[in-house]
Amino acid sequence: IKECNTIFNTQNMILDVILSDKKSICDMNNIYFLVDINFLECNFIEMPDICSIFSNIIDNAIEACIKIKDTSIQKKIKLRGTVINRLFVIKCENTKINEVVLKNNKVITSKKDSFLHGIGISSVKSSVEKYNGNVEIYSDKNKFTITIYIPLTRN
């Protein structure tokens, strides 16, 4: 059994496991991974949606950070989740160097096999829409941000 140095306590066991797994990938790739999530009021979100939302946004952030070869640029992922005005707000920011093309709040992939790419964010949006939430995407030269808003109307 692999030793787990980092203990996450988001109040959701599945999310804690996902975060621990992603943290170990970040550690192997010298990516600073900061997490601050309180999931206490969000246990109405179903397990497949927790997996879809968090795995996809973190995987995308890791992929963008791995592309950074310039050692003067810190590879960094900041993931926060908190309740603001009866909304669970998830915000993931990561450093990047690759150009991100946005069209109608959708990421246009730069990958050659585009058929299979872009599915991650589509999965995130599909999961978020089940809870009447929405997703906002922002990209500038060196930072990508995805913000998710999920109303707390189910508890």
Tell where the protein language model's regions lie, with residue ranges.
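Short alpha-helical Gxxx[C/S/T] motif in the catalytic ATP-binding
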Residues: 120-124
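Glycine-rich nucleotide-binding loop
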Residues: 98, 140-147
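Conserved short strand/loop->alpha-helix "switch" segment adjacent to the catalytic nucleotide/phosphoryl-transfer site
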Residues: 7, 11, 33-54
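Short beta-strand/loop element within the Bergerat-fold HATPase_c
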Residues: 71-86
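Short beta-to-alpha transition helix within the HATPase_c
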Residues: 11-29
